[in-house]
Amino acid sequence: MLGTTFYNESIRKALVAFGTLFNNITIQRVDSSNNTQNILVPLAYAPKARFRQLTQAATGVETQFELPRMSFEWTSLTYDSTRKLNTMQKTATAVSGDTSQLNYRWQRVPYTLDITLSIACDQTEDGLKVVEQILPYFTPELTVAINDVVKHDMPVVLVDVSQEDQWEGGLTGERRFI
C-alpha cells in the first residue's frame, strides 16, 4: 500500500511481551501426606476452546490433559483516537556511528490491542491461586518496555476478570473452570 513495503513485527512483539508476563506462574498443591508440590502452569498462544484439541494433537491420543493451564489470544485491534498525535510529525535519530546522518521515523499510530488470557483448571482453588498471582500487578495497568522500531513503554490494562464454569456429562461428569 502506498508503494512502501514494511513489517516491523510490532503486533508480534506486543503479543510476545504479553505472554512473557505470564509464562512462569507456579502454584503449590499439598497432597494427603502433607507433601508440597510446585506445579508450573503451562501457557500457550491459543483460544481457550483449543486447549483440548492442542493436547490431543500433541499426543495423538485422546487423554485427560494436565490442569491448570493458561492460554492467551489476540481478540481485536482498535484505533484509539484519544491518543492520536500528529501523524505527519517525524522523529529524527542519528545513525549509529555517524552524527551527520539522520534516520527519520513517522509518529506512531495509536491502536488498542485486546488480548484475552484464559485459565483452565479443574479445581476452584487452583484457579484462585493463579489469579491471585496476577491481580496485584495490575492497578489497573502494568507497563512493559517493548523494543519495537524504537524502545517504548506499553501499558497492559486489566479490563475484566470473569469466571466460566463448564460441565461435561451429568452430575459426575468432568468439570472445568475457565
For each feature predicted by the language model, list its residue ranges:
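Small/polar-rich, solvent-exposed N-terminal microdomains that initiate assembly or binding
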Residues: 1-90
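Short, charged/polar micro-motifs that form catalytic or ligand-binding hotspots
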Residues: 1-8, 116-125
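A short linear-motif detector with a strong N-terminal bias
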Residues: 48-52, 93-99, 159-164
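Residue-level detector of functional hotspots within protein domains
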Residues: 56-63, 97-105, 130
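Oligomerization/assembly interface segments of phage tail-like spikes and tubes
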Residues: 68-76, 107-123, 132-134, 175-178
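Short beta-strands and strand-coil junctions in structured, solvent-facing domains, enriched
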Residues: 79, 124-127
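Short acidic, glycine/tyrosine-flanked loop/strand segments centered on an H-E-D-like triad
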Residues: 86-121
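Acidic-leaning, charged glycine-interspersed low-complexity segments
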Residues: 107-110, 129-131, 135-178
